[in-house]
Curated annotation (Swiss-Prot):
It comes from Fervidobacterium nodosum (strain ATCC 35602 / DSM 5306 / Rt17-B1). SUPFAM superfamilies: Peptidyl-tRNA hydrolase-like. The record marks 8 as: Discriminates between blocked and unblocked aminoacyl-tRNA. One of its GO terms (biological process) is protein quality control for misfolded or incompletely synthesized proteins. It catalyses: an N-acyl-L-alpha-aminoacyl-tRNA + H2O = an N-acyl-L-amino acid + a tRNA + H(+). Belongs to the PTH family. GO terms for cellular component: cytoplasm. It is found in: Cytoplasm. Hydrolyzes ribosome-free peptidyl-tRNAs (with 1 or more amino acids incorporated), which drop off the ribosome during protein synthesis, or as a result of ribosome stalling. This is Peptidyl-tRNA hydrolase. Keywords: Cytoplasm, Hydrolase, RNA-binding, tRNA-binding.
Protein backbone atom coordinates (compact mmCIF):
# COMPACT_ATOMS: atom_id res chain seq x y z
CA UNK A 1 0.00 0.00 0.00
CA UNK A 2 1.09 3.55 -0.73
CA UNK A 3 -0.10 6.52 1.36
CA UNK A 4 0.37 9.88 -0.34
CA UNK A 5 0.18 13.08 1.67
CA UNK A 6 -0.36 16.28 -0.28
CA UNK A 7 1.40 19.55 0.45
CA UNK A 8 3.84 22.07 -0.93
CA UNK A 9 7.59 21.55 -0.58
CA UNK A 10 9.75 23.98 1.38
CA UNK A 11 9.97 25.42 4.86
CA UNK A 12 7.84 28.41 3.82
CA UNK A 13 4.79 26.14 3.51
CA UNK A 14 5.46 23.64 6.30
CA UNK A 15 2.83 25.00 8.73
CA UNK A 16 0.20 26.03 6.20
CA UNK A 17 -3.28 24.58 5.95
CA UNK A 18 -2.46 23.16 2.50
CA UNK A 19 0.27 20.98 4.05
CA UNK A 20 -1.95 18.87 6.29
CA UNK A 21 -1.22 15.79 4.16
CA UNK A 22 2.52 16.19 4.77
CA UNK A 23 1.90 16.75 8.49
CA UNK A 24 0.01 13.46 8.79
CA UNK A 25 2.79 11.51 7.07
CA UNK A 26 5.43 13.25 9.19
CA UNK A 27 3.62 11.90 12.26
CA UNK A 28 4.01 8.37 10.86
CA UNK A 29 7.71 8.73 9.97
CA UNK A 30 10.59 11.15 10.47
CA UNK A 31 13.02 9.39 8.14
CA UNK A 32 12.69 10.38 4.49
CA UNK A 33 14.61 9.38 1.35
CA UNK A 34 14.61 11.03 -2.09
CA UNK A 35 12.74 9.54 -5.03
CA UNK A 36 12.55 11.03 -8.56
CA UNK A 37 10.16 13.87 -7.62
CA UNK A 38 9.05 12.83 -4.15
CA UNK A 39 10.24 11.93 -0.67
CA UNK A 40 9.41 8.47 0.62
CA UNK A 41 9.57 6.43 3.77
CA UNK A 42 8.92 2.73 4.27
CA UNK A 43 7.02 1.82 7.43
CA UNK A 44 5.29 -1.26 8.75
CA UNK A 45 1.70 -1.39 9.98
CA UNK A 46 0.50 -4.70 11.39
CA UNK A 47 3.10 -6.58 9.39
CA UNK A 48 2.21 -4.89 6.09
CA UNK A 49 4.83 -2.80 4.30
CA UNK A 50 3.53 0.72 3.65
CA UNK A 51 5.26 3.30 1.49
CA UNK A 52 4.65 6.91 2.50
CA UNK A 53 5.02 9.48 -0.30
CA UNK A 54 5.31 13.27 -0.16
CA UNK A 55 5.32 14.71 -3.71
CA UNK A 56 7.99 17.40 -4.08
CA UNK A 57 6.10 19.17 -6.84
CA UNK A 58 3.84 22.03 -5.92
CA UNK A 59 0.27 21.10 -5.03
CA UNK A 60 -1.16 21.72 -8.51
CA UNK A 61 1.24 19.12 -9.99
CA UNK A 62 0.75 16.39 -7.36
CA UNK A 63 -0.42 13.85 -9.94
CA UNK A 64 3.00 13.80 -11.59
CA UNK A 65 4.19 11.44 -8.84
CA UNK A 66 2.23 8.69 -10.64
CA UNK A 67 4.74 8.76 -13.48
CA UNK A 68 6.93 6.81 -11.03
CA UNK A 69 4.51 4.94 -8.79
CA UNK A 70 1.85 2.25 -9.13
CA UNK A 71 -1.63 3.44 -8.23
CA UNK A 72 -3.64 0.31 -7.58
CA UNK A 73 -3.39 0.33 -3.76
CA UNK A 74 -3.20 3.93 -2.53
CA UNK A 75 -4.70 6.34 -0.05
CA UNK A 76 -4.35 10.11 -0.52
CA UNK A 77 -4.43 12.42 2.52
CA UNK A 78 -5.17 16.10 1.90
CA UNK A 79 -6.72 19.31 3.23
CA UNK A 80 -10.37 20.11 2.55
CA UNK A 81 -11.77 23.62 2.76
CA UNK A 82 -15.36 22.32 2.73
CA UNK A 83 -14.91 20.37 5.97
CA UNK A 84 -14.60 22.18 9.28
CA UNK A 85 -11.40 21.93 11.29
CA UNK A 86 -11.93 19.00 13.64
CA UNK A 87 -13.39 16.59 11.06
CA UNK A 88 -11.98 14.04 8.67
CA UNK A 89 -13.86 12.29 5.91
CA UNK A 90 -12.77 8.97 4.43
CA UNK A 91 -14.03 8.20 0.91
CA UNK A 92 -13.49 5.35 -1.55
CA UNK A 93 -13.46 7.75 -4.52
CA UNK A 94 -14.91 11.01 -5.72
CA UNK A 95 -14.37 14.24 -7.57
CA UNK A 96 -11.70 16.85 -6.94
CA UNK A 97 -14.18 19.12 -5.18
CA UNK A 98 -12.18 22.15 -6.28
CA UNK A 99 -8.88 20.85 -4.84
CA UNK A 100 -6.16 21.36 -7.45
CA UNK A 101 -3.86 18.67 -6.05
CA UNK A 102 -6.64 16.09 -6.31
CA UNK A 103 -7.57 17.44 -9.75
CA UNK A 104 -3.97 16.77 -10.84
CA UNK A 105 -4.05 13.22 -9.46
CA UNK A 106 -7.39 12.53 -11.17
CA UNK A 107 -5.88 13.68 -14.49
CA UNK A 108 -3.27 10.90 -14.14
CA UNK A 109 -5.20 8.00 -12.59
CA UNK A 110 -8.92 8.84 -12.61
CA UNK A 111 -11.06 9.46 -9.53
CA UNK A 112 -11.37 5.89 -8.27
CA UNK A 113 -8.93 6.02 -5.34
CA UNK A 114 -9.45 6.14 -1.56
CA UNK A 115 -8.77 9.37 0.27
CA UNK A 116 -8.79 10.97 3.68
CA UNK A 117 -10.03 14.55 3.56
CA UNK A 118 -8.86 16.63 6.52
CA UNK A 119 -11.02 19.62 7.41
CA UNK A 120 -9.35 23.03 7.46
CA UNK A 121 -12.50 25.18 7.15
CA UNK A 122 -14.46 27.20 7.37
CA UNK A 123 -12.71 29.88 5.35
CA UNK A 124 -13.45 33.41 6.55
CA UNK A 125 -15.58 35.27 3.99
CA UNK A 126 -13.14 38.14 3.55
CA UNK A 127 -10.15 35.93 2.57
CA UNK A 128 -9.43 34.46 -0.86
CA UNK A 129 -9.36 30.63 -0.84
CA UNK A 130 -5.79 30.48 -2.22
CA UNK A 131 -4.56 32.89 0.46
CA UNK A 132 -6.39 30.95 3.16
CA UNK A 133 -4.96 27.51 2.31
CA UNK A 134 -1.46 29.02 2.17
CA UNK A 135 -1.85 30.69 5.58
CA UNK A 136 -0.48 29.18 8.78
CA UNK A 137 -2.70 27.65 11.43
CA UNK A 138 -3.21 29.74 14.56
CA UNK A 139 -1.92 28.49 17.91
CA UNK A 140 -5.46 27.48 18.92
CA UNK A 141 -6.02 25.67 15.61
CA UNK A 142 -2.72 23.79 16.02
CA UNK A 143 -4.04 22.31 19.28
CA UNK A 144 -7.04 20.87 17.40
CA UNK A 145 -4.86 19.94 14.43
CA UNK A 146 -2.57 17.87 16.64
CA UNK A 147 -5.56 15.72 17.66
CA UNK A 148 -6.76 15.50 14.05
CA UNK A 149 -3.34 14.36 12.84
CA UNK A 150 -3.39 11.64 15.50
CA UNK A 151 -6.88 10.65 14.35
CA UNK A 152 -5.68 10.46 10.72
CA UNK A 153 -2.72 8.24 11.59
CA UNK A 154 -5.05 6.00 13.58
CA UNK A 155 -7.46 5.90 10.60
CA UNK A 156 -4.65 4.92 8.21
CA UNK A 157 -3.66 2.07 10.53
CA UNK A 158 -7.31 1.04 10.79
CA UNK A 159 -7.71 1.02 6.98
CA UNK A 160 -4.65 -1.23 6.64
CA UNK A 161 -5.99 -3.63 9.28
CA UNK A 162 -9.75 -3.56 8.56
CA UNK A 163 -10.41 -2.02 5.14
CA UNK A 164 -11.84 1.24 3.88
CA UNK A 165 -15.54 0.45 4.49
CA UNK A 166 -15.08 -0.24 8.20
CA UNK A 167 -12.84 2.82 8.50
CA UNK A 168 -15.50 5.05 6.91
CA UNK A 169 -18.09 3.76 9.40
CA UNK A 170 -15.76 4.29 12.32
CA UNK A 171 -14.16 7.68 11.55
CA UNK A 172 -16.54 9.73 9.42
CA UNK A 173 -18.80 10.61 12.34
CA UNK A 174 -16.02 11.75 14.70
CA UNK A 175 -15.66 15.47 15.30
CA UNK A 176 -12.95 16.94 17.51
CA UNK A 177 -14.12 20.05 19.30
CA UNK A 178 -12.48 23.31 18.30
CA UNK A 179 -13.78 25.05 21.40
CA UNK A 180 -15.73 27.55 19.29
Amino acid sequence: MIVIGLGNPGEKYSNTRHNVGFMVLDRLSNSWKKGPNYLYSDINISGEKIKLIKPMTYMNLSGEVFKYLPHDDIIVVYDDLDLPLGKIRIRKNGSAGGHNGIKSIISFIGQDFPRIRVGIGPKPENIDAADYVLSNFTKEEFEVLDKIINLCTEAIEYIVENGIDKAMNRYNSIEISTGK
